[in-house]
Swiss-Prot record:
Protein name (Swiss-Prot/TrEMBL): Holliday junction branch migration complex subunit RuvB
Function: The RuvA-RuvB-RuvC complex processes Holliday junction (HJ) DNA during genetic recombination and DNA repair, while the RuvA-RuvB complex plays an important role in the rescue of blocked DNA replication forks via replication fork reversal (RFR). RuvA specifically binds to HJ cruciform DNA, conferring on it an open structure. The RuvB hexamer acts as an ATP-dependent pump, pulling dsDNA into and through the RuvAB complex. RuvB forms 2 homohexamers on either side of HJ DNA bound by 1 or 2 RuvA tetramers; 4 subunits per hexamer contact DNA at a time.
Pfam families, alphabetized: AAA_lid_4, RuvB_C, RuvB_N
Species: Wolbachia sp. subsp. Brugia malayi (strain TRS)
Family: Belongs to the RuvB family.
Locations listed in the record: Cytoplasm
Residue ranges, annotated region (Large ATPase domain (RuvB-L)): 1-180
GO cellular component: cytoplasm; Holliday junction resolvase complex
């Protein structure tokens, strides 16, 4: 079995552990979600039970991994992490689950990428805290039942629609993370500047927040790259002028859109009517999954694009943006 590891996004986040909040009270944004999660965690602790299984879903970079880690810290239990693509067979899942202690948190990132055979094994683990594994071959095949301690599965996905209904329904606490407000991103960037020991003007912070697509991961990534420009030029402070110049060099416009976003919008503009995702994928030479996960959510949020049963449609706001930019 491949060892428990991290997805690409999880590995990127690990490099910034000192930026992450470690308790719910320090978590910026997602106010209603956080308040509800506090209730669920405190109730589980009061009953001395394992927290019910949690499903975190929403666009990339909004804090799903961070929340999973905070849940384990709030519960004061161990945290184990893996991802859907790493669990190729039932034995892989069994090897992970049998290492858990009572009430531990198991985090499965990209849970929508679990294959169906693994999902079926997971059903009994989630509901009955046991594993039913087939042992042997042919006529000698038998079922081996392994009892498990009560545990909490925290699944994370950017593609909720790809989860099978039976798996989705086994999560007692489904939580959707939303894009962050401008004010919340400003607070997150300020925290980042303290960790990076970076001196920065308020106008520069606001400029980064405006271009961060409502996403903390992007905000902190842009902050790091701007800091690179500052250090190479031996400047002492991140000014608004420096931030604006660096972001332009990075290909990030005033709305936070990059070349792929603009190419997507222009293709819709040049195509009459609605357009299917596969057609867009071929035209842009870009994976359709990446378009659905990283491009479309923000364009839909800012009302540049509508997703309809017949395909994607450029809105009047999207057309106006293109007319002003090009």
């Amino acid at each position: 079995m491949r060892s428990i590891s991290c997805s690409k996004e999880y590995a990127e986040d690990v490099r910034n552990l000192n930026i992450r909040p470690e308790q719910l009270d320090d978590f910026f944004g997602q106010k209603d979600l956080i308040q509800n999660l506090k209730v669920f965690i405190n109730a589980a602790k009061t009953r001395t039970e394992a927290l019910d299984h949690v499903l975190l879903h929403g666009p990339p970079g909004l804090g799903k991994t961070t929340l999973a880690q905070i849940i384990s810290k709030e519960l004061r239990v161990s945290f184990r992490a893996t991802s859907g693509p790493l669990l190729n067979k039932a034995g892989d899942l069994a090897a992970v689950l049998t290492t858990l202690n009572a009430k531990d948190v198991l985090f499965i990132d990209e849970i929508h990428r679990l294959n169906r055979s693994i999902e079926e094994v997971l059903y009994t683990a989630m509901e009955d805290f046991c594993l039913d594994l087939l042992v042997g071959e042919g006529p000698s095949t038998r079922t081996l039942r392994i009892d498990l301690p009560p545990f909490t599965l925290v699944g994370a996905t950017t593609r909720l629609g790809l989860l099978s209904a039976p798996l989705r329904d086994r999560f007692g606490i489904p939580l959707r993370l939303e894009f962050y407000s401008f004010e919340e991103l400003v607070d997150i960037i300020k925290r980042g500047t303290k960790v990076f020991s970076a001196e920065i003007e308020e106008d520069a912070i606001q400029e980064i927040a405006c271009r961060a697509r409502g996403t903390p991961r992007i905000a902190l990534r842009l902050l790091r790259r701007i800091r690179d420009f500052v250090e190479v030029k031996d400047n002492k402070k991140i000014t608004h002028k420096i931030a604006d110049s660096a972001l332009s060099k990075l290909g990030i416009d005033k709305m936070g859109l990059n070349k792929l976003d603009v190419d997507y919008l222009r293709f819709l503009f040049n195509t009459s009517g609605s357009v299917g995702i596969d057609t867009i994928s071929i035209a842009l030479s870009e994976d359709s999954g990446n378009i659905e996960e990283t491009v479309e959510p923000y364009l839909v949020k800012i009302s540049f694009v509508k997703r309809t049963p017949r395909g994607r449609v450029l809105t009047d706001q999207g057309k106006e943006y293109l007319s002003l930019q090009y």
